[in-house]
Design a protein with these regions (language model features):
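Periplasmic-binding protein-like
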Residues: 58-59, 130-142, 222-265, 282-300
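Bacterial N-terminal signal peptides
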Residues: 13-24
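Acidic, polar ligand-binding/catalytic clefts
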Residues: 78, 82, 87-153, 164, ...
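Alpha-to-beta junction loops
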Residues: 86-87, 105-114, 157, 198, ...
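Extracytoplasmic small-molecule ligand-binding "clamshell" domains
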Residues: 33-120, 189-192, 278-279
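Ligand-binding clefts/hinges and TM-proximal coupling segments of bilobed small-molecule sensing domains
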Residues: 31-37, 45, 166-187, 229, ...
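Bilobed "Venus flytrap"/periplasmic-binding protein-like clamshell domains
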Residues: 59-63, 67-83, 135-194, 215-216
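Extended ligand-binding regions for polar small-molecule ligands
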Residues: 31-38, 71-83, 140-143, 147-166, ...
Length: 300
């Protein structure tokens, strides 16, 4: 999961009240603007580019995004640009301290394609998927059927964990830290990947099981033959949550833009689900049931 450590940017105040003087009495009832024209007016006030979908993204952050446009957020941006009738452009910046401030907050782009819902660094759209931290292990191992960090089998296993993530708290709760191999939370993604390093250690036998953010676990599991097993961790209690809703992030002032994105999410949820499933993302509905390719129309 992505982690940033910056303060929220200041809202941009625009002199929009003067527009009210331009409204001719009775004109609104005589000719209501279409939804598209209302969107266009709102976006012009909000300084959202009306012709270009300007996306803020990390250039080295698979499975989410990269400069080769191979990530699922790249593909989602392509889908939305097509639906909006816009061209697509990127502002690239590493997903680390300063990401929001240097991209969305500086008006260099208009949307972050994936952000935890409720994070106060951005204004969130409605969520378009829900997922969780997950176990990742070799198929056919004696960990088949595991679904909790309290499972007794883990006491004899070497466990890979990204330090500082919510899942690491449960290793402490279950007295498993002595069995853990930590991986760095913040790395230079141009040259390093904690998720990829963990999967390599799993393949070599350095660790027996890894705990990764679900989209990363699913993506790397699909790269192997046979595919690695991915099991969302859904039963933990007494610590931080491990399940999250993911939305898009916009500026707090851009309410019309947020509404437009919300409509796109609602109208294209099945296509969004299918795209994410294709990348191995373990999708969950609100009852923690898996959303699969057999039933991709369900909402998060």
């Amino acid at each position: 999961m992505r982690h940033t450590a910056e303060r929220r940017w200041q809202k941009l105040t625009l002199p929009g009240l003067a527009l009210a003087a331009l409204i001719v009495p009775g004109a609104a009832s005589a000719q209501q603007p279409s939804r598209d024209s209302r969107d266009s007016m709102e976006l012009s006030i909000e300084l959202v580019d009306p012709k270009v979908l300007r996306v803020c993204a990390d250039p080295h952050n698979l499975p989410f995004s990269n400069e080769k446009l191979e990530g699922f957020e790249n593909k989602l941006a392509e889908l939305f640009a097509k639906k909006l009738g816009k061209s697509l452009a990127y502002t690239w910046f590493p997903q680390a301290t300063g990401f929001v401030r240097q991209t969305l907050g500086s008006h260099r782009c208009d949307v972050i394609m994936g952000f935890p819902q409720g994070d106060d660094l951005v204004q969130s759209t409605n969520p378009y998927y829900r997922t969780a931290y997950a176990f990742i292990f070799k198929p056919g191992s004696d960990l088949e059927g595991i679904d909790s960090l309290s499972d007794e089998r883990l006491k004899a296993k070497r466990i890979g964990i990204v330090a500082g993530t919510p899942a690491a708290t449960y290793l402490a709760i279950n007295s498993l830290l002595a069995r853990a191999k930590p991986y760095a939370l913040m790395v230079d993604t141009r040259i390093d990947s904690s998720a990829e390093a963990m999967v390599q250690d799993l393949k070599s036998g350095e660790i027996d099981v890894g705990i990764l953010w679900g989209p990363m676990a699913g993506y790397y599991a699909k790269q192997e033959t046979p595919a690695l097993r991915v099991v969302p961790i859904l039963k933990e209690s007494g610590g931080p949550r491990l399940t999250y809703r993911l939305a898009m992030g916009v500026r707090a002032a851009d309410q019309g833009w947020k509404r437009q994105l919300n409509r796109l999410i609602q109208e294209n949820q099945s296509e969004i689900n299918a795209l994410l499933i294709g990348y191995g993302v373990p999708l969950l509905d609100e009852k923690d049931q898996p959303i699969t390719a057999d039933a991709p129309t369900r909402k998060p």
